[in-house]
UniProtKB/Swiss-Prot annotation:
Subunit structure: Heterotrimer of UreA (gamma), UreB (beta) and UreC (alpha) subunits. Three heterotrimers associate to form the active enzyme.
Gene name for this UniProt entry: ureB
A Pfam family this chain is assigned to: Urease_beta
Disulphide bridges, residue numbers: none
Protein name: Urease subunit beta
NCBIfam families the UniProt entry points to: PRK13203.1, urease_beta
Pathway note: Nitrogen metabolism; urea degradation; CO(2) and NH(3) from urea (urease route): step 1/1
């Protein structure tokens, strides 16, 4: 092995297998690009992103860790979200939750 070398297994890697997911349409009403990281609580993203916010409480993007999705001004796209795992307690971000999630599934 060479220092810094990656040895990557061939084929597809499944992420979040068996976890609850949902899709939503998101539109950037702002005048600047907005980037959302893989583990950001989607409910608390930039207010310039317009979507059914209440339906996304407790969810994050269903993308590989360390990656992000970029929304250009005026861009509309569908994203897939995955339910946050673990104790489902959210702290930080924009401070909209700050504790236990009260998720209304259905």
């Amino acid at each position: 092995m060479i220092p810094g070398e990656y040895q990557i297994k061939s084929g597809q890697i499944a992420i979040n297998t068996g976890r609850e997911t949902k899709s939503t349409i998101v539109e950037n009403h702002g005048d600047r690009p907005i980037q959302v990281g893989s583990h950001y609580h989607f409910y608390e993203v930039n207010p310039a992103l317009k979507f059914d916010r209440e339906a996304t409480k407790g969810y994050r993007l269903n993308i590989p860790a360390g990656t992000a999705v970029r929304f250009e001004p005026g861009q509309k796209r569908e994203v897939t979200l995955v339910l946050v795992a673990g104790a489902q307690r959210i702290f930080g971000f924009r401070g909209d939750v700050m504790g236990d999630l009260e998720i209304k599934n259905g």
